[in-house]
């Protein structure tokens, strides 16, 4: 229901609202930005007039009605095998950057060499100190009733030089973490690589720009399988390869910080139109080799699963037109299909092959066969959506970044000037739960309905948000998560095979180029009190949400659900 209302601001900023249609008053989350939002899902279009009705309207931004009690998700909406958990990554939380034999990663090097590239000039040297405080992280998971912890392995902690003999103290750390999780009834889901390549390999041959990385990654994966595979039964080979390639080799805002000459980045010695595709190609080849190794030697009982975690963004056409509908399809191809289609059918999307040309590497027939159907499970990391607007394909348009190759711009506002959803405090995240439902249905209808986990989903607290007066009262995060959990349920009800939802993140962490200025955690890290963990409002809600006895939850047989196939519906 679209609600058009007039409101009068009183001195306490309480909004007294009466709708033109005579609807009852609603509690609304308002943001201070001069735009309005047309009805999408549960959002409503509100025009606020301060003063008399005759005064010109001053729209103050997208708003949405507060969820009614019956709209707030309940644990019994999902079957007992559906998994709720939280995610982190090694560099962002562990600290201990040079302790117990760990070698430097590309992120250690990037933060130490180019501190000006981090918004608050911080680094992950200590981070949340999870290397020493991992038991506190496990306790927080237990207190919230979470059943899964998704974390990543630091390549340079267990292989300081990237290759060779493992560092036993690094192995011990992850063994201790895994054992503690299992002792407390929490299932480990392990990401083998989450952006922190050993600096030794970057120095030796250029990291993911060199095909040699494929064999070295395979060795790293083998060490992980051999060291932890007796207890870890769910693996993701790579996390967010799309974002990594674009930010690390296109824009150069993430380690190793490469971009084309003349652009503003740490290392303007690259090629922003080629290197992202080269690095991405080697990531896919490394994934295929690791999966082949895993299935041949480390899953003899057939009880383990392996896949990849993709960063995804939802898209709506900028306006109701054929050209923008096509732009949306290309945007999805470049954002999701770039890495998804090779692991489903063995090659890149047709639109990418057509528009990128010889800058996009080719797979051999053998490589295609290894890649096709190489994921038992898939992770989707979803935060926000955009409008997709067609850009004319002509000789007058010259791409500067690989992201220009889709000939579709990503817009936060539609053709009517309205934002796609309320901004959340984090400058790049506009809340749009429908985008998640739509993506899950795309996975169902176009990609064979694979088993999916929402491996990341959340928003950040930021100091600049005037509504954030108490770091533990993260009411925006709670509302965001409730709406997105509901969006997952909507997709499940329409047949999508979704197996779990993991919030990003478990704890406040080092947020890459944003440093510690964006805090994504369910758990607050008090840096003034020895990195003490404190549950936020959202964490306490999860504790209540997850408290429903398992015996009261329904059971759904997933044994006959379709596996990931090598076919794509076009």
Curated annotation (Swiss-Prot):
UniProt tissue specificity: Expressed in young seedlings early after germination.
From what superkingdom does this record's organism come?
Answer: Eukaryota
What does it catalyze?
Answer: Hydrolysis of terminal, non-reducing beta-D-glucosyl residues with release of beta-D-glucose; DIMBOA beta-D-glucoside + H2O = DIMBOA + D-glucose; DIBOA beta-D-glucoside + H2O = DIBOA + D-glucose
Q: Which GO terms describe its cellular component?
A: chloroplast
Presequence range in chain numbering: 1-50
InterPro entries cross-referenced by the UniProt entry: Glyco_hydro_1, Glyco_hydro_1_AS, Glyco_hydro_1_N_CS, Glycoside_hydrolase_SF
- Between which residues do disulfide bridges form? 259-265
Which GO terms of the molecular function aspect are on file? beta-glucosidase activity; DIMBOA glucoside beta-D-glucosidase activity
Activity profile over pH: Optimum pH is 5.5.
Known EC number: 3.2.1.182, 3.2.1.21
User: What is its quaternary makeup?
Assistant: Homo- and heterohexamers.
* PANTHER family (alphabetical): 4-HYDROXY-7-METHOXY-3-OXO-3,4-DIHYDRO-2H-1,4-BENZOXAZIN-2-YL GLUCOSIDE BETA-D-GLUCOSIDASE 1, CHLOROPLASTIC, GLYCOSYL HYDROLASE
Spell out the note in the miscellaneous section. Wheat is a hexaploid with three different genomes that contains at least four genes coding for GLU1: GLU1A (AC Q1XIR9), GLU1B (AC Q1XH05), GLU1C (AC Q1XH04) and GLU1D (AC D5MTF8). The monomers can aggregate in diverse combinations, reflecting the several isozymes found in the native enzyme described in PubMed:10750901.
Protein name per the record: 4-hydroxy-7-methoxy-3-oxo-3,4-dihydro-2H-1,4-benzoxazin-2-yl glucoside beta-D-glucosidase 1c, chloroplastic
Which organism does this sequence originate in?
A: Triticum aestivum
The protein's gene is named GLU1C
């Amino acid at each position: 229901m679209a609600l058009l209302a007039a409101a009068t601001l009183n001195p306490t900023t309480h909004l007294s609202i009466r709708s033109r249609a005579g609807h009852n008053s609603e509690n609304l989350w308002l943001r201070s930005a001069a735009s309005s939002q047309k009805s999408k899902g549960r959002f409503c279009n509100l025009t606020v007039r301060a003063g008399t009705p005759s005064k010109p309207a001053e729209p103050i931004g997208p708003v949405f009605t507060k969820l009614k009690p019956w709209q707030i998700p309940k644990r019994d909406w999902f079957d007992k095998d559906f998994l709720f958990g939280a995610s982190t990554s090694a560099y962002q939380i562990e600290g201990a950057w040079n302790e117990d034999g760990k070698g430097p990663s590309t992120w250690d090097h990037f933060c130490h060499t180019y501190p000006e590239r981090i918004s608050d000039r911080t680094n992950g040297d200590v981070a949340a100190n999870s290397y020493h405080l991992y038991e506190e992280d496990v306790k927080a998971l237990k207190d919230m009733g979470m059943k899964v912890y998704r974390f990543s392995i630091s390549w340079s902690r267990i292989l300081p030089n990237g290759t060779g003999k493992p560092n036993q103290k690094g192995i011990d750390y992850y063994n201790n973490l895994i054992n503690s999780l299992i002792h407390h009834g929490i299932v480990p889901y392990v990401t083998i690589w989450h952006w922190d390549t050993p600096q030794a390999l970057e120095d030796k041959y250029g990291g993911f720009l060199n095909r040699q990385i494929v064999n070295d990654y395979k060795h790293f994966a083998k060490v992980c399988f051999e060291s932890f595979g007796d207890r870890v039964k769910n693996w993701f080979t790579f996390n967010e390869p799309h974002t990594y390639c674009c930010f690390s080799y296109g824009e150069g805002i993430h380690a190793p910080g490469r971009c084309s000459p003349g652009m503003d980045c740490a290392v303007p010695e690259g090629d922003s139109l080629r290197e992202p595709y080269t690095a991405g190609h080697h990531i896919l080849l490394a994934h295929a080799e690791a999966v082949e190794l895993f299935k041949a030697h480390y899953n003899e009982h057939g009880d383990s699963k392996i896949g990849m975690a993709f960063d995804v963004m939802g898209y709506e056409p900028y306006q109701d037109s054929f050209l923008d509908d096509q732009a949306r399809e290309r945007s999805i191809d470049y954002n999701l299909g770039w890495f998804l289609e090779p692991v489903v059918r063995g090659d890149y999307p047709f639109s990418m092959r057509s528009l990128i040309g010889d800058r996009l590497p080719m797979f051999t027939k053998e490589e295609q066969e290894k890649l096709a159907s190489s994921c038992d499970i898939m992770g989707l990391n979803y935060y926000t959506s955009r409008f997709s607007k067609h850009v004319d394909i002509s000789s007058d348009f010259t791409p500067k970044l690989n992201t220009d190759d889709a000939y579709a711009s990503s817009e936060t506002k539609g053709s009517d000037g309205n934002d796609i959803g309320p901004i959340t405090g984090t400058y790049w995240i506009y809340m749009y739960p429908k985008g998640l439902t739509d993506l899950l249905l795309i996975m169902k209808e176009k990609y064979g309905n694979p088993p999916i986990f929402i491996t990341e989903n959340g928003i950040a607290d930021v100091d600049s948000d005037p509504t954030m007066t108490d770091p533990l009262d993260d009411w925006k995060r709670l509302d965001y998560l409730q709406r997105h959990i509901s969006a997952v349920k909507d997709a499940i009800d329409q047949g999508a095979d979704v197996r779990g939802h993991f919030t990003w993140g478990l704890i406040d962490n080092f947020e890459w180029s944003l440093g510690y200025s964006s805090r994504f955690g369910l758990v607050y890290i008090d840096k003034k009190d020895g990195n003490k963990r404190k549950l936020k409002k959202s964490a306490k809600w999860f504790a209540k949400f997850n408290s429903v006895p398992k015996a009261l939850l329904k059971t759904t047989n997933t044994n006959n659900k379709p596996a990931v196939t090598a076919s794509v519906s076009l």
